[in-house]
Each structure stands twice: as C-alpha cells, then as structure tokens.
Regions:
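Charged, alpha-helix-forming regions
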Residues: 1-224
C-alpha cells in the first residue's frame, strides 16, 4: 500500500456524490490498481481482498470481511453527478457496471461503468494524484472529499470554494442549512481529522458578502 496512488480527473474530484466511508475506500482501492496512462477496458475486473483492505485501512480482518460485504452490497446503486456550469449541462451515471462479493474467498470484484472510464483515463486531462495511505486513517467520507478538494490545489496552497458548490459536491443541499451546523458536523471534524492523520496542515476561514457567509477559504501545505 505504501506506494499505492489514487489518480482522478479533476472533474471527478469536483463531482457530486455521496458514498459511505467504506464504499469510498472500496472505490479508492480499485482506482489504485489503474494505470491512468493506459486505456481502461470496460470489462476489466478489479479485485479487493479482505486481507488487503484490513492492512490498508488498519481494521481487524474479521471486520474487513463484513465491511467489504456491506459496502459492495450498495455500491451498484451509487451514482455520480457532474456539472458543467459554462456549458450548462449536468450528467448522472453509476460508479460500477458490476460488483460481486465472494463469500468463500473474502474478496470483492468490480468493474467500473462505461461512463466513468473517461474520468479515469487521464491522457490529455487535468488530474489530481495522491497516496492512498494519506486518507487511509480518515474517519469519514466527508474528510476524504475535503482532502481531495484541497490536494487538487497543492501547488498554490490555497482554495476558495463557495458554500453552494460545496453543498453540491457533498450532496448536502438540504442538510445542515445553518452554517453553525455545517461547521460543527462537517467542516471542523473533517479538517481536524486531516490535520491529525494526513500529510496536510490546513487552516480555513469564512468569506462574507455583507453579513452573509458565501464561501470558504482554505490555506494549506504539506506537513514538514
């Protein structure tokens, strides 16, 4: 796992989707098996074993069995929403075409959907890459999403993101409507987790338009 890399198109980093923590881990584990410089074939199956999952995410092997089974059981229904505000288009597609849990072998096999493959074939695209181990100890799917959104801008060390866009990306438009709740339950726990468990140190602040909070500003760097 030490050298396993997650590489995604920036469009995928900023897409709207909601996965559980372990569904997210399952997808990321499969992505590390790709070589983004080579075409991904639709029929390719990717294998994630309970032993590998246990080692990567530091969970007991028996827990890894049930975790993989549960995460794989819902993965086929999970979708992604893409936004192109300039072209005024929206897309929606599944993560996977197929997913199987092999009870006797304690493993999952999955194949990515035809529609997501262009976001994983990284030739001629802007993309974000990071080591899987950096997010392996994050405790929520939201923390993983924040890490990806920040590391996408690691060269500048700054990122502004509107609350509207953040809610769209995290698919929480109708949740945590008060900023106090958004900060308490999503932002603060995610950033604190990133600061304690990854290679980033992050500070953040609000941006206002008059009295209204409209955006968030993040300043970050790789920890020394």
């Amino acid at each position: 796992m030490s050298n396993a890399l997650v590489t995604k198109s920036n469009h995928l980093v900023e897409a709207g989707y909601k996965l559980s923590l372990n569904e997210q881990r399952l997808i990321l584990s499969a992505i590390t098996q790709l070589d983004g410089r080579k075409p991904v074939q639709r029929e390719n199956d990717f294998i994630i074993t309970a032993a590998e999952f246990s080692e990567t995410f530091n969970i007991p092997i028996k827990q890894a069995y049930s975790t993989l089974e549960e995460a794989s059981s819902r993965l086929y229904e999970r979708d992604i929403k893409t936004f192109d505000h300039e072209a005024k288009t929206r897309g929606r597609f599944r993560w996977v075409d197929s997913v199987k849990y092999w009870d006797g072998e304690a493993k999952v096999t999955l194949s990515f959907s035809h529609s997501i493959i262009p976001y994983l074939n990284l030739l001629h695209q802007q993309f974000t890459t990071y080591e899987l181990k950096q997010v392996s100890q994050l405790k929520t799917a939201y923390a993983i999403r924040f890490y990806e959104l920040l590391v996408q801008f690691i060269k500048t060390g700054e990122r502004y993101i509107s609350l509207e866009k953040l809610r769209e990306i995290l698919e929480i438009k109708n949740q945590y409507k008060r900023f106090y709740d958004l900060k308490k339950y999503i932002i603060d726990p995610s950033i604190n987790n990133i600061n304690s468990s990854t290679n980033l140190t992050v500070d953040w602040d609000i941006v206002k338009n008059g009295k209204a909070i409209t955006s968030l500003m993040f300043v970050f760097q790789k920890a020394q």
